[in-house]
Amino acid sequence: MNERYTFSGHESFYCKSLWLKKGYDFVKSDKNFNAEDAVVYLGVGKNMVSAIRYWLRAFGMLEEGNPTEIADFLFDNKNGKDPYIEDLGTLWLLHYYLVKTEVASIYKLFFSDFHKEKNNEFTREQLQHFLKRKNAETGYNNLYNENTIKRDIGVLLQNYVMPKRDRPNEDFAALLLNLSLIRQSEDDNKTLYFNMNGKNELVPEIFLYAVIDDKKEEMIVPFDRLMDLALIFCLSKSELVDTVLLFVEKYPQQLRYTDDGGIKQLFFLKDFNKNEVLKNYYKKR
């Protein structure tokens, strides 16, 4: 059997803007999500308590009940770089972690595999069929539940698609809305798009962080590998090249980009610590 996908767990709640910080502080205070007073401390209902824990795990902020290194880096009350998520770069970083961790399988499948297959235009129904097919390929057919997948799709879209302006303010509280990565057609309610042209500007350092994180120990990254990452950030091929050239210019001692006879590659000339990239970015804020 192949990789086993996981769906549901969010209790049908998208991730609200302050939930990660609220959940992080809760865990750092040695509180227990299963305790009766969790609803009092967090100020939400029981299902939302479960949802907050789920999103902490899905965004890679919590592992085995403990805050991760990146969670401390961002949210620590004393030294956290962006505890209240005021910087656009933090949103891009959290988006990357949501896709990367695969606690919520739908995000990697959607932004990587489905995006590559469908190009930029899609419907909910097409995404549903795609997820059913991908799940069947794993051999775990008995784990597929149509209603569960529909709820996952609905929550994913709530996380990323800006609601119509006649909706309640509560609908505008999703953490990742400001990235504008997905948009809905103005002509109908069915067609959706990966917002390649209208998304918010990607912070180059966050993409570089993702490249270093993804490449592991490799010192040469082929262009196809970069394009796979670019899909996650809804970057076009030309935007990808521009972004790579930006950070190659900034770090000439560590990086070189070549295009020899159409073979494009990014070379790492020496070891490059991804955490130093983040520290340099947040230092200039």
Predicted ranges, named:
Residues 1-285:
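Donor-sugar nucleotide-binding helix/loop cap in glycosyltransferases
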